[in-house]
Design a protein with these regions (language model features):
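PLP-dependent class I/II
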Residues: 1-145
Length: 145
């Protein structure tokens, strides 16, 4: 129940880097806190057993979908010889990578948008189909050669 986006338009790379670093920390304090309305919705759900059952069923469907996507990514990564951080559950798959910015730029040219981190790459399995989760590890492995 959180949402936020920031865009940096800076004249220099140094200013952009500073903006990114500041936002990584300050945005968490602002955008990661639940709002009063969201807290009220959660309270209402937990007060109604039927509604809670519906929410739990819906949550299970999404969780199962995310796990299936992660497993597809994990299986293809193994087939492609791509080392990844073991996937248990969640929204992201992580790949150790010594040059994440370079690999990210290469993949962008192919329409694959991943997040470069300090020591690796992060792929959002939450934002792409299971089929794409199965295909992307091969592209990443190729880009890392």
């Amino acid at each position: 129940m959180r949402c936020g986006a920031m865009i940096c338009m800076a004249k220099t790379a140094e200013i952009a880097a500073e903006f990114k670093q500041v936002c990584e920390f300050s945005a968490r304090a602002t955008w990661s806190n639940s709002t009063r309305a969201a807290q009220k919705v959660i309270a209402n759900i937990y007060e109604d057993e039927k509604l809670l059952a519906r929410v739990n069923e819906e949550r299970k469907q999404y969780r199962d979908m995310l796990v299936a996507r992660g497993r597809a990514f994990e299986k293809s990564a193994k087939e492609a010889g791509l080392e990844i951080v073991p996937f248990d559950s969640g929204f992201f798959a992580s790949i150790p990578c010594p040059n994440p910015d370079e690999i990210s730029r290469k993949l962008e040219k192919e329409g694959i948008f991943i997040v470069p981190l300090a020591k690796g790459l992060r792929v959002s399995v939450a934002s792409i189909s299971e089929e794409r989760c199965a295909a992307i590890p091969f592209k990443i492995a190729e880009a890392m050669k």
